[in-house]
Structure formats: C-alpha cells, structure tokens
Regions:
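Active-site cofactor/cluster-binding pocket
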Residues: 1-191
Length: 191
C-alpha cells in the first residue's frame, strides 16, 4: 500500500513558503512520519518563484514530486497556482491565496495577469480559494499569510490530530508565536 502523500507549496520570494514548509515538516516528523523535503529558491530575492516539495508517509524514498502526482498544491499567490497546477493529480486539491503579486512583464504592460486562474483550477481539481492576506490582517501581522495557508492545508489534509501549537512555538521567533498561532487557527477555520 502506498501511503505517501505529496504536498507542493509555491509562492513568491518573501512570502514565507519555506517557513511554512519547515513548520509542516517538523510537525510531521515529530508525529512519526518519514518526511522528505526539497526547496527551489529560484530568483526568490527578486520576487521570483519559490517552491517546496514535502512528501510524507510510512517510508519515503525521494522528496521529488513528479508532474501529475501531487496530492495538494498550496499556492501563496494566484499566478504561482497556474504555473504549478500541472503537478496535481486528477483527484488532487488546491489551496490558493487570492492575493496577486504582478510580475515585471505585467508591471511594464507587456503581459496581462491571466483571467480567472481560480476558475481554471476548479475545472481540473477541487480548489479552495481564500484571501489569506485579508484574513491575516484581522489577526494582526500581514506577514503571517503563510501560516494561514498552512492552517488551511492541515485541515484539508486532515492532519488536525497533531498539536501544531508547540511546533509553531519551536519554529518561529518568540515574538511571533502568538500571532502565528492565531493565523494558523484562522486558516483552519477558513476551510
């Protein structure tokens, strides 16, 4: 039986994709899963694409997620969801932040932001669109949208039996523990 689950987290540099992956990975390891993670930073310091592949289960041999094999795609920005959608299984799920960060070609007017990315995803897979950026403004720290999306992912993957509060406390800076716990809870509540 293949019990390995594959999660692809994608975003733009500075959105906290890697931190969310580290919290996820730490929680899974501490709860007995074999976990493999792979990061691709790209031009992350210049608002470029960042992706993290997390695979977990009883025994995982590789961190690499092939095209058409991801169980879930968590996108911190809409365009990144379109860019990585081909990695999802036919019965996969997408959790997408509706926040948009225009790329340089869009800013210069040489390209347009694609219309209805969420609609395109919904035609292919089960898609949960949420305004993680708006949700986190109510929590108090706009930089915690990554943890809102992590909370939504945990709920969507049915990993709610894990106590994530101590994991968050171990992984984020002490000054940001409370706001990240609130962001995580808000993400779970949004799904």
């Amino acid at each position: 039986m293949n019990d390995v689950k594959s999660i692809l987290l994608v975003g733009v540099g500075g959105q906290g994709t890697i931190l969310a992956s580290k919290i996820l990975t730490q929680g899974l390891i501490e709860n007995g899963y074999d976990v493999k993670m792979s990061e691709v930073h790209g031009m992350s310091q210049r608002s470029g694409s960042v992706s993290t592949q997390v695979r977990f289960g009883t025994k995982v041999y590789s961190p690499i997620i092939g095209e058409g094999t991801a169980d879930i795609l968590v996108s911190f920005e809409e365009m990144e969801a379109a860019r990585y959608a081909h990695f999802l299984k036919k019965d996969g799920k997408a959790v997408v932040n509706t926040y948009r960060i225009p790329s340089m070609p869009i800013l210069t007017g040489t390209r347009d932001y694609p219309d209805d990315i969420i609609g395109m995803l919904r035609q292919r897979v089960s898609t949960m669109a949420l305004d993680a950026t708006g949700i986190v403004e109510k929590v108090g720290n706009p930089k915690s949208a990554n943890v809102v999306l992590l909370g939504a992912l945990v709920k969507a993957m049915r990993l709610t039996d894990i106590d994530w509060n101590p994991i968050i406390a171990k992984t984020v800076k002490p000054a940001f523990i409370d706001v990240n716990r609130k962001a995580f809870a808000a993400g779970m509540a949004a799904v």
